[in-house]
Amino acid sequence: YGAEVIRIERISGSEDRYVTPVSEDGQGAMFLQLNRNKLGLTLNPTKDKGQDIVKKLVERSDIVIANLPEPTLKSMGLDYENLRSINPGIILTSNTAFGTTGPYAERVGFDGVAQAMSGAMDMTGDSEQPTKAYAPYVDFCSASLAAFGTMLAFLEKQKTGKGQRVQTSLLQTALTTTNSLLIEQEILNVNRFASMNRAQTSGPSDTFQTKDGWILVQTVGQPLFERWTNLMGEEDWLSDEKFKDDLSRGENGHLISERMSQWC
């Protein structure tokens, strides 16, 4: 569907092509998932022939997407100024680890690094050991934000004919998911710690073991809590100060989880 997309890799193939190999030739599951309906080619953009191919592609393209640090883009002639000299209407979307300015601009990084630096790992698992989420949500969220920004840039180009630079970074994306915690800490000086699956700002919100497996219950807001107290036969909890609102229920979540566990 949609655009014609050409993925360009190094001559030997990029590393991500072979992560979690599932095919006879070693191609990885995520590579196959993310490259459906895409075209592909390999080249070396630092060689004359590779540069000629890149130039021809840029001349007829609307968008270039790259996940390389700024110095690397410049060394390959893929920086925005050079691309714009070839095609004034080009849109360059770059997704780096830490952005294109600042002390970390030239560093590379992975999903897990952003999870760690954003504080997300400190709020995952238990308080004894920071825990990384298995699913690379920062990678996927960064790509989604990049796609959103790119489409807005493309809509603007259709109106004005002008291209522009779109930038996302893994750390910015990860911080987007933890900003509420950082804001709370800055304003209220609240320093939260991981509490496994139990939420800290509402309840019941936790995982519970039943006779035939585990379930997750997530309750936010007074109406749902009232329904839960009716289910538990604990209507008197509605007048208990410990459970008067979401935050109070989160702070006393261990009591709510204990009651829910008994019911399960």
Feature roles, as predicted:
Residues S12, A97-G99, L170-L175, D212-W214, ...:
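Glycine-rich beta-alpha junction loops
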Residues M30-L32, V166, D206:
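Residue-level detector of beta-strand structural context in well-folded domains
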Residues T100, S127-A135, Q158-A174, F193-Q200, ...:
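Conserved Rossmann-fold dehydrogenase catalytic segment
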Residues Q115, Q164-Q167, Q218:
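Glutamine-centric residue-chemistry signal
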Residues P136-M151, L170-T178, V220, L224:
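Mid-domain beta-loop-alpha active-site segment that forms a flexible
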Residues A143-Q164, T176-L188, T229-D236:
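Oxidoreductase and adenylate-handling cofactor-binding alpha/beta cores
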Residues P204-C264:
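Aromatic-enriched alpha-helical interface/lid elements that frame and gate functional surfaces
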